[in-house]
Each structure stands twice: as C-alpha cells, then as structure tokens.
C-alpha cells in the first residue's frame, strides 16, 4: 500500500439542494442556500438558493479585523451569496465560486466578479473551484465542469464546458496533483444501475477531460443519492474522499483511491490500476472536508469532528480521533505542513493546528448577532490565507498562533 503523499489542494466544500426538481428563480432573487446535510438530486438548480437568511454575514455588525489578524475584505457580491469554494495558484491569482453561479477573481489588489459563464442551463450553484496553475482553472457547476485558461478580466475570460458521462450525476469536488486531476461526484443510483463516484483524468483537452477514467463503484451502491462530498489528492496517484449520507447511514465513510501495482491490489498482468478502499473514520457524523500531506490526512465535519490518519496508522485502516475545541460543524480544511493546518465552519469558526493542539482564532464576527457559516479555506502561503462563507470573504496576513 502506497504511503501518504503531499496534497496539492484543499478540500472543497460541497453543498447540495433538495431532491425534488425545483424551478429556478431569477438571479435577482438571492437567498442564502441551506447548507446543511445534503439530500439532493444532481440535476437540481439553485432555485434562488432559498434558505435561512440568519446565517448571512452582516458586516455592519462586525469588526473590520479581529485581534488574530482575520479581516473582512471588500467583495463585489450580494451578501446573500454563499462563497462555497476558494482556490488559487498564488498570491495574485485567487479564485472563488458560489451560489447564483458566482465566479470571483483576486489579482493581488482587488476582487472582481466575472460575467456569468455562458452555458445554456439553469443557474446551478458553483460547488467547487480548483486551480492547477494560472492557465488551468476548473469549476464544478451543477452537472457540468467548466475550464478556463486563466483570468482575462470579467468579460474576456474564456471558458469551455463539458458534462461528464452518467445519468443524474454532478461533480461536487475537484482536486489535482502533478498533471493528474480527480473529480468527486454526487450520483443517483437507480435500479441497481451504478454510476462512478470518482473520475480521474490527465487534464483538459479540446472541450473535455483528457483520458478520463471512471473508477469502479463498489463503495457507492446505495439506490438513490450516494457519492462523494469532498475529495483531495495527496499525490499524482492517490486521493482521499468523504461520502454523502445515504438512506443506509450518515456521510461518515472515507475512501482512498490509489494507483496500485499488481502486487499491491492491482489486477495481475494488467499493469497499475486504480483501487478504491474504505477506511474507518470512527464517527457516525457527516464529514465535510479533507486535506493531507506526507505527515497526515485530516478530516473535519459535523459537530466539530476532527480525525487524522498518519502513515503509521495506514495499515490499520482506522483514523485517529483528535480533540476539537468547538462543537460547530466544520466544513473546510487546508494546510501547509505538520504544524500549520486551518479548518473553518459554522458560527464564523476558524481553527488552527500548531502541531500539538487545535485552537480557535478570534473572528471579526465574534461580537455580531449573526455569524456566517464558513465553507472553504485556501492559502498561497502561511501568511496569505483566504476563507469563503455566507456573503463574506476573510483574509489572514499575519502569523497564526
């Protein structure tokens, strides 16, 4: 079994809407989407992202910056837009996506909102963005993957689009490493017709995935909604993902996909092949985010759950329970090394791991009556960390505790 390798991306928060086919409201009818336990059909539009407005950020009731160095930054969006995912290639190339098909870009000075990606479909929520480089941008949008060769401005940025194979499926998380891209999908199994929850490819080419492989689906065979909530690569040949809740249980399943040689689980005489194995998360709570490096793979989720897998524990297949300082749901995680990992979640929760203990950072919303949910965290460096949430983007430029 291969060792845990360095991860090249953050986990990506995935937040889906109700299973009934909802009619899409106009883009002016913005309400924060209810981002709780997923119960979804892959082909459901935003429906105006209707939900509980209490979770939206109220900057008027918040401080510009907290004592910890977290600051609210100006972003050209309605405060009811949920920023669901953040990724970038560097300090001057940061992307964020969210509800109402919102796409944002930061060039090192200001955030700009892109024109809506031209696509003949209802305005789905942008579930995930992954940036492999300045000229390699991937976005999950309902049942569709969009790809751009880089930011050229709000109106001039060029996109190509592709719908992946399968019926009632939707990409929910994207990750990549060293030329390899892996996509986690929500699937809807009908009458024992099982779709692939994991798709891997060698990049983007001529309007679609280059050399796509749809991985065997042994672990995702619940009739109805199943598949992956988050996914993160730990090397070009390895990724970890967390599952959706199903009628059979909560979203507490964890799988590892890796390219195995014939002597390590692959088919004899067939050369290396992708294998998918399930691991014990030691929780029955929903798991919303995953991140890892050569030292550990981290999981975060419902009720402040934090789990860790180290190379020493990999043969056992069992994750370690790590004490959490909060009971709020944690929805995103990203890190830079063994002593510098970030996690974010409900009630404006921002946590940091210093190699020994998780601690909560002061937030600009600590004194606010309504505290936003935070969904995604990504950084170009330890002193350049971005966080997206309910109507807000936070930036950290200091030194974490």
What are these regions (language model features)?
Residues 20-23:
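C-terminal motif of bacterial Sec signal peptides marking the signal peptidase cleavage site
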Residues 7, 38-40:
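Generic hydrophobic alpha-helical membrane-segment signal
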